[in-house]
Amino acid sequence: MAFCRLPHLVVNSSPIRSAQTGVHEQLATLVARHADPTHPFRKPVTDYNLRAFDASLAAWRAAGEAPLILDTGCGVGLSTLHLAMRHPDHFVIGIDQSADRLARNTHWDGPQPTNLCFVRADLVDYWRLAHQAGLRPAQHYLLYPNPWPKIGHLARRWQGHPVFPFIVALGGRLECRSNWQIYVEEFTSALNHLTGGTFQTEAWRPEQPITPFERKYLASGHALWRCVADLDAGLAA
């Protein structure tokens, strides 16, 4: 089986530092506001993102519309490749807003899986378009998103962003990972607020890291955290 030889990484990653010591006190209010149908999120979708979304759907349909996995914020795409190898009966769409990251050498040894595509798109638009199109991904990953650790940056984190209800509405098995425990605790809290679920934050130590960040954080001795939620069943996975 093909495997990924990650590029050399200097082990000098510092833990996230923040004045915030727990779930943000404004999170519940913000999540409720964003879920309020009388205050819809009206940011226009750009033509570029619409074309990118349509192209990714065309690739999925051309591959037979296998059960879908979304790897959102996939960076250089290593996680997308790993997910495609691990789930050969699924189709994986790796989405990132940076053309530079998507174009980098991923150091993947052996043949690349064919059950995937990469698309450059803004996630805020992509998630809303996916919801509008009625997509129901089987699995949905947010791996090590930008933590925005300053207290005043809550609204920049996905759980504090107006797009969060669209992420949840897509359903499926949703997984978020981070090396900042508070980020995952907030993500979990926001999920529970929207769904009435009892999802949990858990410590996470993978047998094989699937992103450069995951490998770097592990090698630097960071604790890793994740939330896994089966949104269709309403139960923690």
Over which residues does each language-model region extend?
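S-adenosyl-L-methionine
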Residues: 2-68, 78-85, 107-134
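Conserved beta-strand/loop positions that form the S-adenosyl-L-methionine
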Residues: 72, 95
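Class I SAM-dependent methyltransferase "Motif I" SAM/SAH-binding loop
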Residues: 73-77
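Conserved SAM/SAH-binding beta-strand->alpha-helix loop
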Residues: 98
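Charged helix-capping and loop-helix junction motifs
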Residues: 155-163
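Conserved beta-strand signature within the Rossmann-like core of class I S-adenosyl-L-methionine
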Residues: 170-178
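Class I S-adenosyl-L-methionine
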Residues: 183-190, 194-237
